[in-house]
Amino acid sequence: MESQQLHQNPHSLHGSAYASVTSKEVSSNQDPLAVSASNLPEFDRDSTKVNSQQETTPGTSAVPENHHHVSPQPASVPPPQNGQYQQHGMMTPNKAMASNWAHYQQPSMMTCSHYQTSPAYYQPDPHYPLPQYIPPLSTSSPDPIDSQDQHSEVPQAKTKVRNNVLPPHTLTSEENFYTWVKFYIRFLKNSNLGDIIPNDQGEIKRQMTYEEHAYIYNTFQAFAPFHLLPTWVKQILEINYADILTVLCKSVSKMQTNNQELKDWIALANLEYDGSTSADTFEITVSTIIQRLKENNINVSDRLACQLILKGLSGDFKYLRNQYRTKTNMKLSQLFAEIQLIYDENKIMNLNKPSQYKQHSEYKNVSRTSPNTTNTKVTTRNYHRTNSSKPRAAKAHNIATSSKFSRVNNDHINESTVSSQYLSDDNELSLGQQQKESKPTHTIDSNDELPDHLLIDSGASQTLVRSAHYLHHATPNSEINIVDAQKQDIPINAIGNLHFNFQNGTKTSIKALHTPNIAYDLLSLSELANQNITACFTRNTLERSDGTVLAPIVKHGDFYWLSKKYLIPSHISKLTINNVNKSKSVNKYPYPLIHRMLGHANFRSIQKSLKKNAVTYLKESDIEWSNASTYQCPDCLIGKSTKHRHVKGSRLKYQESYEPFQYLHTDIFGPVHHLPKSAPSYFISFTDEKTRFQWVYPLHDRREESILNVFTSILAFIKNQFNARVLVIQMDRGSEYTNKTLHKFFTNRGITACYTTTADSRAHGVAERLNRTLLNDCRTLLHCSGLPNHLWFSAVEFSTIIRNSLVSPKNDKSARQHAGLAGLDITTILPFGQPVIVNNHNPDSKIHPRGIPGYALHPSRNSYGYIIYLPSLKKTVDTTNYVILQDNQSKLDQFNYDTLTFDDDLNRLTAHNQSFIEQNETEQSYDQNTESDHDYQSEIEINSDPLVNDFSSQSMNPLQLDHEPVQKVRALKEVDADISEYNILPSPVRSRTPHIINKESTEMGGTIESDTTSPRHSSTFTARNQKRPGSPNDMIDLTSQDRVNYELENIKTTRLGGTEEPYIQRNSDTNIKYRTTNSTPSIDDRSPDSDSTTPIISIETKAACDNTPSIDTDPPEYRSSDHATPNIMPDKSSKNVTADSILDDLPLPDLTNKSPTDTSDVSKDIPHIHSRQTNSSLGGMDDSNVLTTTKSKKRSLEDNETEIEVSRDTWNNKNMRSLEPPRSKKRINLIAAIKGVKSIKPVRTTLRYDEAITYNEDNKEKDRYIEAYHKEINQLLRMNTWDTNKYYDRNDIDPKKVINSMFIFNKKRDGTHKARFVARGDIQHPDTYDSDMQSNTVHHYALMTSLSIALDNDYYITQLDISSAYLYADIKEELYIRPPPHLGLNDKLLRLRKSLYGLKQSGANWYETIKSYLINCCDMQEVRGWSCVFKNSQVTICLFVDDMILFSKDLNANEKIITTLKKQYDTKIINLGESDNEIQYDILGLEIKYQRSKYMKLGMEKSLTEKLPKLNVPLNPKGKKLSAPGQPGHYIDQDELEIDEDEYKEKVHEMQKLIGLASYVGYKFRFDLLYYINTLAQHILFPSRQVLDMTYELIQFMWDTRDKQLIWHKNKPTKPDNKLVAISDASYGNQPYYKSQIGNIFLLNGKVIGGKSTKASLTCTSTTEAEIHAVSEAIPLLNNLSHLVQELNKKPIIKGLLTDSRSTISIIKSTNEEKFRNRFFGTKAMRLRDEVSGNNLYVYYIETKKNIADVMTKPLPIKTFKLLTNKWIH
């Protein structure tokens, strides 16, 4: 039957997965594997070995089963899943027999997929799919697929069948894949498929047929199990499961690459060089090999490459081995230069050598210069070869006198070594430096030298030594001239005597010459003969004429040597030898001064510029150049730090043919962020190709018009000033250059626009390098001067002026000289940022000072004046009326510049600038210290509690951790916004005021979170895109910025005042980022609940959904294009859900008796807007909800710079009793302060070691802390926190791996004293932890939801605590800590084993540890999108670090979990919750009263009663209670606040404490206070009397209502569904900058579980738009809570949304889109429609008077406030 089907359908070709090809094997000209000839025998042996393991049954062609081959059982081939091979059809044994499957017995059940499209093949005809089983392959030369598509017949030509093709073995591991591919390709070749296998280039000889394709696919699948394939193969097959040939092609290419790598390594290891080929050829060969390895991700270090090269050097190059033997920092380029120089010298000497020496020379002279890091050292090597193998015996002493040369003026030295070698003393000129260098002629092999010995030379008429150390009575040489045997001069530096003291006490002295230009010290026998001393070479001794032995001589190599131990050292000064007159350096300008004045240019440029007279009025001889080449400027090191240089030679050669100013290079840099609007954000630079003249122009944007104006200006300038026309401008392909406007501009003026090629920025090297240079200078100048960042372009302009005036290393002239301009007048230049006093020609009063402090920037372009920055006026002026401020204290304070106080030198250079100011302005130092417990004295008695280790007590010197800062104000500067990490500018080093960033929102209790644009500062969580949030990263210490900031993030705390995030930021390991001032964080196990915990607050502009867990809420199918209008009300069960059912059981006010004075709906009126905006903390601009007029009106606001100005010249106009200026005042602008609120510092709640123990005068408390200390030590040792077997030396450990540690102490609410040993994670190096690890705690919404569900379902609530939780988590990194202070081991370290509290990774390690245990051992699952919420069928767990809250219907289920936890962790039961009566809990700061099946009350009465009185706020001053936290109509005055510096810090600190505590309380349960908390939090930096009074009023209201509780009652048991409702409201335009306030309240089954009040992130233009914004912010969190409720309680859920804006509901329900005013409004409304419809959300109207969310958006009258809150807070 099957054969008939095949005959009827010739297109359905069949193939077998195991069948042999019955055709002639196709030969291949090139092996695609490129296997070398040496590897082929091994390959054949492996193949033969495999073949030998398979036995062939006689009489058949079948191959029996073997272990290399797929088992015939069906289970041997794993079923495809998760991207494995697709399985369309299975081959059964019967089908296999029917299809002539004879060769491999019965195969396993094989898959046979339909053909899919592949890059190398054609798509088959869909009418003829592949069959479900494949017959044997029978064609040898089938037609390609093309012919089959034309319905042609399959060729029937048959060739000889190969019946015994051995299959490849089965792939056994991923590592053996490439070896298996070799066998598999050999198998395909033997199966006559070699011509369709692609080579490494992807080329094939012919197209395959369907039959061959199926054959290859099935055999590959059979012998290569999917799970054993490499990842890259799986990725290919997941895209196209049948694309086997692509896999083979890439495998061949990778194997060829591996083969080439092996060849390159072999070639590199076997390098040899003897000079027979050119050095350039050798260098190219080696560099090519190294480059190929680098392209294959194999980096060969310079040291390894040099070692391999040195190993292969021979001949004259062999000496380099000894030279580099001791070097550790070998450079490959340096070694190549050495080899090249030796090669060139040999080549020259071979050409110059006389013919009689070319054949019979005994000497080969090689000279080589060796670079050195300190000085230049020239070493000459003379390789001496004798014709005799015998040692060279010294001649008799009388032979030396037969020299043909005069001993006085023309002494002859034989076999000497000559070259120039300088002394190592950097402070003195070297010996012989004025002598000419002789050409080396004769050396001895360096291997023959005997250290610390003199070579005895019978042919030398003079004794020569290299060191003056042994030279007595030395005098500088002025007349003696020595030559060697080749009559080459040897420079002599000094003449003296060598004093010998031989072993029998004989002393003698001989004349000696000093020269450093020889390789060895030579001792002349002739000189010894003059002292009656001879050398006996038979007995190897020095003897007197009477036979007395004076000293032994040593034979070493071919020569005899005398030890230098018989020489008497001299004690002469090198000054007497050098004879250098150093008096010339007197009155010279120090080089660091010139370096600063000339814009921190490099040494060579400055020196060359002075030589070429590019700088006038200053000569090269006027500068002290000693050590100038090695001078390291700290500012240059910081400002000019770079990764790598641009590639040299990237510029094309033909560009050099242009004339000056005909060829320009241009590029744009920017933007620079966080600058005032007046400061440019970009600059565009131009460089002339010929002269290298540079121009820079500032830009505020990159618009076409701005760029065009600059080009017009530069072309006109060049034409008029230099009489030249620009022909070509080279640019990159940025859109600012490639636009039509600029292209037309170039075309009209005949200018050629030359663009770089795609992705070839290196071709634009001239402009790129200029930008890099200018930015290096900019960073350096700003860092050196300490000027604010908005002056960055002034630094660039100053750098341009200097660079145009200096000679570059590649040019002989400066750019100005090339352009025909005069050199730079040095008298017109001041150091950038030089303090000056500017004359004020128009003072406000005749008695005011006439001088204004300023800072010099750069010479003016438009006048002969100077551009000077005046911080007090916040502007720059162009003036000549200035004088340099001569004040040593006004110099740089970043470094200790002993040589940079150049008042006298600067006066000489700028004498004409001195005029009218002579006073100095004194300054004080500014310090910052960071210390730990190890600086304090330990008073712990070791006998109080036995410890595991033998700890010894050691006292330490007590130091005070906190030092009161002394403010140092160098000048009056404005404060710029913080520069992002991508900015080029450094932070101002002297900024004494907080950096301000706009952060403006509070969420659920006044959450104030960072909202920076930098990724590392991101702290928001968007539910729609699932961004994980982070805690604020950069908190400002407004009270004491100069104190130590700690960021002990792993101490378990909670953010107070704001929606607690379910995830922590990327760089942290816990949910809190502490950076405390003057303190360390709380260490209470439930520190958020600690009695003295003060919250961290941060202002944010994100919406509520940004801080809630993200749930996948993608819309369902209805969002397809055929659904034009979404349904507002869901279809299912909509008939059962009504507005009444949604409103039922909600705690809404009862309005049956409406009061005539009720003003709860006043917010819907539209009063007239006042012309003057009044920013109110309690109600906005005019009324409780002020709206703009109906007519559109443009609103313009003054640009208020976000700064806090320090004004020194502000006079007290109210009191003129004294003409003395008052103390420094802070002038605070309201809008700037509101925009500047970024974070609030937590108040320290813990004690340091010295406070708790060392200096604690309360002996009882001290004893308790000591007891807690020992308890903590024992716990640490019991948990094996560190390695107790070994102490490590600090000097042996990488400092990055060392973490400082300290003890912190705290008193918990229950009265117990707690000690905690923590690591200083705030100073932990980033390389020591993984920033991607997440540390999570339960979200407060999740806790409230769980509590609500527990009440409705009568759950038991069990509270647990795990002691020392972090110490159960192992640490992966290698970290070390300092031992506890009582051990006294300050110089030792301990190796950490566990995740110590304080480490950045500890929280993440603990989270992963406990999560894994709960999932694997307790059968729990984490709820998706809600971290730290775990559940199974019976129990729900909320995890907050080491606190666990268990909810279950069955108490036994809780106890089962507890039993499992106790097996692994020290678990304490805080409250089992078994009682049926009222149970009191203290859960994460909430005081909860719970009676199952009845009610639950949440409050904080005890905590507030204890904490509020400690805030130093007068409570109940008038003896009556407040009824509301604030009243409408109270506005904050906009007048600037002028306040003393110290008073300002004190008041800001007070605001931090008050608002912080209020935010914490509001976040937990007092949602009715959120609006007031949020608004006051925005005024933390504006602590006026009015703001403080309003804050006191809020605290007073909290005190009066401290007994209020959030009351929940059990839901009616008749309700079959869970009902989740969000109530939304917005107050339009009642915040600064016309921002709107939005608020939402969330209720589950009628119980309020959360609330949010925040300023809208966008400026809304109408009331409706504000309401839409509020609704859109509520929906994501509503959806996420819905998912959580459904996970925790399987009942159906109804979601409702209530708003008092009928227009918003109308827009959601309307199908008319023409009413939308603009695209933004329309897209937001349409998105809202989709979200409402797609999430089964019911939207209903609620009366304004019943809208309890009204309290979140505006201040309300007392009656209205009570009416809206008394049903849920009472």
Swiss-Prot record:
Q: Which GO terms describe its molecular function?
A: aspartic-type endopeptidase activity; ATP binding; DNA binding; DNA-directed DNA polymerase activity; RNA binding; RNA-directed DNA polymerase activity; RNA-DNA hybrid ribonuclease activity; zinc ion binding
Catalytic residues in the record: D457
Q: Which GO terms describe its biological process?
A: DNA integration; DNA recombination; proteolysis; transposition; viral translational frameshifting
Localisation per UniProt entry:
Cytoplasm; Nucleus
Q: Where is this motif: Bipartite nuclear localization signal?
A: 1193-1227
Pfam families named in the record = Pol_BBD (PF22936), rve (PF00665), RVT_2 (PF07727), TYA (PF01021)
Region annotation Integrase-type zinc finger-like: where it falls in the sequence: 579-636
- Which stretches of sequence are listed as region RNA-binding? 295-397
Cite a GO CC annotation. cytoplasm
Q: Where is the Integrase catalytic domain?
A: 656-831
Keyword entries, A-Z = Aspartyl protease, ATP-binding, Cytoplasm, DNA integration, DNA recombination, DNA-binding, DNA-directed DNA polymerase, Endonuclease, Hydrolase, Magnesium, Metal-binding, Multifunctional enzyme, Nuclease, Nucleotide-binding, Nucleotidyltransferase, Nucleus, Protease, RNA-binding, RNA-directed DNA polymerase, Transferase, Transposable element, Transposition, Viral release from host cell, Virion maturation, Zinc, Zinc-finger
Stretches the record annotates as Disordered: 1-88, 359-453, 1005-1037, 1057-1205
Q: Which catalysed reactions does the entry list for this protein?
A: DNA(n) + a 2'-deoxyribonucleoside 5'-triphosphate = DNA(n+1) + diphosphate; Endonucleolytic cleavage to 5'-phosphomonoester
- Identify the residues that the record assigns to the RNase H Ty1/copia-type domain, covering every copy: 1625-1767
Biased composition, Low complexity: where in the chain? 369-381
Query: What the record says about its domains?
Result: The C-terminal RNA-binding region of CA is sufficient for all its nucleocapsid-like chaperone activities. Integrase core domain contains the D-x(n)-D-x(35)-E motif, named for the phylogenetically conserved glutamic acid and aspartic acid residues and the invariant 35 amino acid spacing between the second and third acidic residues. Each acidic residue of the D,D(35)E motif is independently essential for the 3'-processing and strand transfer activities of purified integrase protein.
Q: State the remark under miscellaneous.
A: Retrotransposons are mobile genetic entities that are able to replicate via an RNA intermediate and a reverse transcription step. In contrast to retroviruses, retrotransposons are non-infectious, lack an envelope and remain intracellular. Ty2 retrotransposons belong to the copia elements (pseudoviridae).
Please describe what this protein does.
Answer: Capsid protein (CA) is the structural component of the virus-like particle (VLP), forming the shell that encapsulates the retrotransposons dimeric RNA genome. The particles are assembled from trimer-clustered units and there are holes in the capsid shells that allow for the diffusion of macromolecules. CA also has nucleocapsid-like chaperone activity, promoting primer tRNA(i)-Met annealing to the multipartite primer-binding site (PBS), dimerization of Ty2 RNA and initiation of reverse transcription.
Quaternary state and interactors: The capsid protein forms a homotrimer, from which the VLPs are assembled. The protease is a homodimer, whose active site consists of two apposed aspartic acid residues.
Q: What is this protein called?
A: Transposon Ty2-B Gag-Pol polyprotein
**Organism the protein comes from:** Saccharomyces cerevisiae (strain ATCC 204508 / S288c) (Baker's yeast)
- The gene it comes from is TY2B-B
